[in-house]
Structure formats: C-alpha cells, structure tokens
Amino acid sequence: GYVNGLNAAEETLRENRSSGDMDGSAAAMRSVSHNGCGHYLHHLFWRCMTPNGGGGEPTGDLRDRIESDFGSYEGWEAEFREAASWPAGGWALLVYDPVTKQLRNLAVQKHNDGALWSAHPILALDVWEHSYYFQYGPDRGGFVDA
C-alpha cells in the first residue's frame, strides 16, 4: 500500500544520500509524492468518514468561510459535486490556500496530479471506483450524495 511505498522510497533516498550514489533517487522522489499523497488523502478521507467526522452541513467558522469564499453553502456544494463527478476518478478536495487566503475545491487525479502547492486539505472525497462500486455500483453520484 501507500505507507509501504512511501517508507521504501524514503529508505532509498536515505541510502542514496548516505552513499552519494543518486541512482534511483528520481524514481524514489516520484514515489514519495505519489505514495505520500495517497496515504495522506486516505487518512483524511477516513477521518472525515468516521462518526466523529461531523456529517451534515458545517457550522461556525467553516460555514462562514465557505459562504464568504463561495457565495453560499449551496454554491460550494454544487462546485464540490462537480469536482467529484469528473470521469477519470480521483479525489474531490476542499482545501485552504494560504497564498490567496481562500478555500478552494480541487479535482485531483492520482493523488498528486492536480494538487495545489501549499494548500491544506480540509475535506477529502475518494471518487475512485474502489470507494463506491461495491455499494453503489456505477452510481458515483449516489455515493457523492450520501
């Protein structure tokens, strides 16, 4: 899985730095990006899906910020659903972008393609088929609605 891939890549980089032989370092760095992002996004996704993950509409500061940055909660939700609906699968993310000091929705493929540098994920929805197909079949929209 992602943790094993990340750990193996980190070990390769440590060994290469120690020996001075950089053969394989470029592939290991790509593996750190792919497996690290895969691990971090799944970790956030499962935290969001737990009973303590909240559920329902946000309240307080997060709700206020969504309304400020997207115009309304409904506007944010419609855009987030669009991020989750692209045919290639991947991730729909609500992130905080410290450069623009705004919340943004992102559609990210392959864990790290389409990521926004410096953005901090707040909400992650895994829309790869393995996340919904067993329960929802090809109805990704039903999974997103749930």
UniProtKB/Swiss-Prot annotation:
Substrates-to-products reaction catalysed: 2 superoxide + 2 H(+) = H2O2 + O2
Protein role: Destroys superoxide anion radicals which are normally produced within the cells and which are toxic to biological systems.
Organism: Haloferax mediterranei
Protein name, entry field: Superoxide dismutase [Mn] 2
Class of this enzyme: oxidoreductase
Molecular function as annotated in GO: metal ion binding; superoxide dismutase activity
Annotated SUPFAM superfamilies: Fe,Mn superoxide dismutase (SOD), C-terminal domain, Fe,Mn superoxide dismutase (SOD), N-terminal domain
Cofactor note (record): Binds 1 Mn(2+) ion per subunit.
Protein family: Belongs to the iron/manganese superoxide dismutase family.
UniProt keyword terms in alphabetical order: Manganese, Metal-binding, Oxidoreductase
Cofactor dependency: Mn(2+)
Binding site for Mn(2+): H42, D126, H130
Pfam family, one: Sod_Fe_N
Gene3D superfamilies, per database record: Fe,Mn superoxide dismutase (SOD) domain, Iron/manganese superoxide dismutase, C-terminal domain
EC number: 1.15.1.1
